[in-house]
């Protein structure tokens, strides 16, 4: 698919919308030269969570960040239409003529990165997975059954009764309170993104956007040789179970920071990522 491109007059950043399945469009930004590096954001957030990395990484790489479907400036999903975030990521890569890329994901972005390791490792130069793991719950090959639909109906009703604003406030507090000594520095940027989030996902029948078990089966059997760095926060205990299936995997625990480590300790996070990628 051809990307609809525009050039921002005040910078060297290229931005636009990329058509994807179901008539949806994905907002993206691209900056820099060199090997491609793609940033994958977390749930309830958008491309702005990568502000501490985007310009810095673009000094060495061609950096792409985009809003997943249902977030930021990208299209909202259609109930009943099955898609995955991995398929949308591959659409972005194909549209921008990117064959292989370094993939950096945090939280939900890391879930998608692990999906890619299982199903499309040949399109990865390396991978950095922060605050996220390989999911093994039901994937798209197992449609939602009546029991799950009933549970979702109850969840949606409970959220409407509680109020979306209250849910967002609690979600924000959870992310901030998980942090270390610099946690208050992330409150403002997170509050802005979560405030702008439509909360489409918890208010609808969201399709299985993470490949999860479908990808995990392939991940376990393939033992992908892609260089992988797994980063966990100060609350982590023990090594990630995924390491035993990654011949070229490494693990780092970042102290004095929580789930949103890239925002809370950007200098340390940036150094970890850039040192790892440049050594490949």
Can you name each region flagged by the protein language model?
Residues 118-119, 124-160:
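Flexible "cap/lid" loop of the alpha/beta hydrolase fold
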Residues 21-75:
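Conserved HGGG/HGGXW glycine-rich cap/lid loop of the alpha/beta-hydrolase fold
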Residues 195-247:
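Conserved serine/cysteine hydrolase catalytic core
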Residues 31, 52-55, 65-108, 263, ...:
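Active-site loop/oxyanion-hole signature of alpha/beta-hydrolase fold enzymes
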